[in-house]
Design a protein with these regions (language model features):
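Basic, low-complexity segments
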Residues: 1-33, 185
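Short, flexible segments with low predicted structural confidence
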Residues: 13, 26-29, 38-41, 64, ...
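Hydrophobic face of alpha-helices
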Residues: 13, 68-71
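Glycine-/proline-rich flexible loop or hinge segments
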Residues: 23-28, 50-57
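Glycine-rich, flexible loop segments associated with nucleotide phosphate handling
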Residues: 34-38, 171-174
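Short, amphipathic alpha-helical "recognition" segments used to contact nucleic acids or chromatin
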Residues: 35-50
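Short, well-ordered secondary-structure "scaffold" segments embedded in the functional core
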Residues: 55-69, 76-80, 84-214
Length: 214
């Protein structure tokens, strides 16, 4: 339901409880419909599944308005609880090469909001720049930008280029990307003649073996 292990959920509930100074239920007046544990699980469920709040209310035995209040209260607290851990993972990832790519978070067409339609993906949404380690594990995301933005521009506008600036330098750890990131400083793959590639690969392999074992 949440995508997290039971012990991870328990730790998050404990972190939220601490931020609330140990007080979830009001001292006076009407009690909350959900205890803190179920309220956190509800919020995690919606963050993972993006279901309608009315559907979540049916599943958790409460009204849509209760769901809305719970999510508004707990979502920023969950961000606070995970902030330090996420920062530590980012710092570890900055020691080696990373991958970057953009994906479209669908929004549908919104009145009065321009530049949402992505010609590349043939849908309206927000362009999210995501950074992972070489094993594909997420380590960072940028601020959402309109879906019409090309990835090379979104890299800068999202703040990722600034936060990972050292990886975009010639002597940096390296940021691997597809050809949509040409001109950003990211390593965008082989663009020379394919007939030359086998020899280049063997040379690079030999040099790397020499570096490690020589």
């Amino acid at each position: 339901m949440t995508g997290l292990r039971g012990d991870q959920v328990t730790d998050l509930v404990g972190g939220v409880f601490d931020l609330l100074d140990g007080v979830w239920q009001p001292v006076r007046g009407r009690r909350r419909a959900l205890g803190l544990y179920r309220a956190v699980v509800l919020t995690l469920f919606l963050m993972r599944r993006n279901e309608a709040q009315a559907v979540a209310g049916e599943l958790f035995g409460c009204s849509q308005s209760t769901v809305s209040r719970v999510v508004r209260r707990l979502r920023p607290l969950l961000r606070q609880v995970t902030a330090d851990f996420a920062g530590q993972i980012r710092q570890q990832a900055k020691r080696s090469a990373v991958l970057v790519d953009g994906f479209l978070a669908p929004t549908g067409n919104r009145a009065g909001v321009s530049d949402l339609f992505s010609g590349k993906r043939h849908a309206a949404g927000l362009n999210i720049q995501a950074v992972s380690d070489l094993a594909g594990r997420l380590v960072d995301t940028g601020l959402p930008v309109p879906g019409a933005r090309h990835d090379s521009k979104a890299l800068t506008e999202s703040g990722i280029a600034d936060r990972w600036a050292n990886h975009l330098k010639p002597a940096g750890p390296g940021m691997l990307a597809d050809l949509g990131y040409l001109g950003t400083g990211a390593n965008t793959g082989w663009r020379g003649r394919l007939t030359d590639f086998p020899e280049i690969l063997r040379t690079v392999t030999g040099l790397e073996i020499y570096r490690i074992w020589g």
